[in-house]
Amino acid sequence: MVDTEMPFWPTNFGISSVDLSMMDDHSHSFDIKPFTTVDFSSISAPHYEDIPFTRADPMVADYKYDLKLQEYQSAIKVEPASPPYYSEKAQLYNRPHEEPSNSLMAIECRVCGDKASGFHYGVHACEGCKGFFRRTIRLKLIYDRCDLNCRIHKKSRNKCQYCRFQKCLAVGMSHNAIRFGRMPQAEKEKLLAEISSDIDQLNPESADLRALAKHLYDSYIKSFPLTKAKARAILTGKTTDKSPFVIYDMNSLMMGEDKIKFKHITPLQEQSKEVAIRIFQGCQFRSVEAVQEITEYAKNIPGFINLDLNDQVTLLKYGVHEIIYTMLASLMNKDGVLISEGQGFMTREFLKSLRKPFGDFMEPKFEFAVKFNALELDDSDLAIFIAVIILSGDRPGLLNVKPIEDIQDNLLQALELQLKLNHPESSQLFAKVLQKMTDLRQIVTEHVQLLHVIKKTETDMSLHPLLQEIYKDLY
């Protein structure tokens, strides 16, 4: 059940002013005035059991760090880069509630026009032309010259082998191109753009869905500073910026204070509080920032601000953490997670080494991230996916479900077609992505259960007031 009085969550969803005196007073009614500033410094930090830390000699520490870093450096470059930024040309949609036409949606073989089975030897090609080109190259076949410039199509492709091979070369097939594997994004966008005008002419509704996808992506870029594309560039070493500082133990954490601009973790030399608790508190403050970012994004989803105000609150209350963990996956690989806007990389093993229950918090997120990242969604996919999460009509306590479901239905159509076009080789991707929504709910449920444990065991530690309000009556 959703509480109707929410003293910490602004109804205009600015979520930007935090006043400690207001937060400590639970007697007042919900203020509908917009918050204008964020002042996290007004929230006093609780006192924890002090644990002494000592600074090692800087030169010795740097030497030891460099040696140890060699063991962890490869962790930052272990995954292929995510597909590049969104291109409007690649966002093509068909008519709602209608299976895409094979003649339009299936990418054609560049040689004969048959349905392409994949990206082979540098171009999209059917199985027949792929095999023909492979045999010709491998056996070094030489065909009788033909000067007729025969037209190569599905029914005639076997009639003139010379012209067929010349067509293979003309469209860009190359034996060396096999090493590149999947289709380059630029080539994919070019091919999709070739059928864009035909689709829009036959299905005017698709233009609306394309506009929706573009709008959501633009809002996504404005709302979330560290996108997946930027994060993957850092993790794969494909950025001109310096590599993130790797934190793998207590000593490297202390060294990191001199190299990373921590926004929410008090430096060890100033506060000797237990590391696990301070890291947990830092995660809380980052979560509060993420709630603000998600809220701003939600306000830009067409139709969201027209919903009942209480339903807007409910949708965000139940959706924000599912989105936080979706976005967190973009910052993760199997070995660790980017922190402080990509300045640092904290290893998975270090986080697991924190004392219980804090050491248990991140492991389910890593397990989810590894599987979710395997789907290879890009930022244009994620922009629609998180909108679908927000507009979930089955959240407890909703007052008017119908308009919410109508908006989500439109978003689901956009997502399904987006995935079919952006990932033509993954026919079951839409179903797999929807399954992740169920997984995310389970992760949030487990997270809330761990918070209950902390509430009982860490009696002198409190949650951020905004997060308290979100977690109230949540699962």
Swiss-Prot record:
Cellular component terms (Gene Ontology): cytoplasm; nucleus
ZnF NR C4-type span: 109-129, 146-168
PTM summary: O-GlcNAcylation at Thr-54 reduces transcriptional activity in adipocytes.
Keywords per UniProt: Activator, Biological rhythms, Cytoplasm, DNA-binding, Glycoprotein, Isopeptide bond, Metal-binding, Nucleus, Phosphoprotein, Receptor, Transcription, Transcription regulation, Ubl conjugation, Zinc, Zinc-finger
Gene Ontology BP term (one): positive regulation of transcription by RNA polymerase II
Chief subcellular location: nucleus
Localization, UniProt: Nucleus; Cytoplasm
InterPro entries recorded: 1Cnucl_rcpt, NHR-like_dom_sf, Nucl_hrmn_rcpt_lig-bd, Nuclear_hormone_rcpt_NR1, Nuclear_hrmn_rcpt, PPAR-gamma, PPARgamma_N, Znf_hrmn_rcpt
Mechanisms controlling activity: PDPK1 activates its transcriptional activity independently of its kinase activity. Interacts with HELZ2 and THRAP3; the interaction enhances the transcriptional activity of PPARG.
Interaction with FAM120B: annotated span: 175-250
Location of cross-link Glycyl lysine isopeptide (Lys-Gly) (interchain with G-Cter in ubiquitin): K222
Phosphoserine PTM sites in chain numbering: S82
9aaTAD (motif): residue ranges: 465-473
SMART domains, per database record: HOLI (SM00430), ZnF_C4 (SM00399)
Known DNA-binding region: 106-180
Span of domain NR LBD: 208-473
Gene Ontology molecular-function annotations: chromatin binding; DNA-binding transcription factor activity; DNA-binding transcription repressor activity, RNA polymerase II-specific; E-box binding; nuclear receptor activity; transcription cis-regulatory region binding; zinc ion binding
Pfam families for the chain: Hormone_recep, PPARgamma_N, zf-C4
Residues listed as glycosylation sites in the UniProt record: T54
Family as reported in the entry's similarity comment: Belongs to the nuclear hormone receptor family. NR1 subfamily.
Domain writeup: The 9aaTAD motif is a transactivation domain present in a large number of yeast and animal transcription factors.
PANTHER family reported in the protein's UniProt record: NUCLEAR HORMONE RECEPTOR, PEROXISOME PROLIFERATOR-ACTIVATED RECEPTOR GAMMA
Function: Nuclear receptor that binds peroxisome proliferators such as hypolipidemic drugs and fatty acids. Once activated by a ligand, the nuclear receptor binds to DNA specific PPAR response elements (PPRE) and modulates the transcription of its target genes, such as acyl-CoA oxidase. It therefore controls the peroxisomal beta-oxidation pathway of fatty acids. Key regulator of adipocyte differentiation and glucose homeostasis. ARF6 acts as a key regulator of the tissue-specific adipocyte P2 (aP2) enhancer.
Subunit comment: Interacts with FOXO1 (acetylated form). Heterodimer with other nuclear receptors, such as RXRA. The heterodimer with the retinoic acid receptor RXRA is called adipocyte-specific transcription factor ARF6. Interacts with NCOA6 coactivator, leading to a strong increase in transcription of target genes. Interacts with coactivator PPARBP, leading to a mild increase in transcription of target genes. Interacts with NOCA7 in a ligand-inducible manner. Interacts with NCOA1 and NCOA2 LXXLL motifs. Interacts with ASXL1, ASXL2, DNTTIP2, FAM120B, MAP2K1/MEK1, NR0B2, PDPK1, PRDM16, PRMT2 and TGFB1I1.
Identification of the protein by name: Peroxisome proliferator-activated receptor gamma
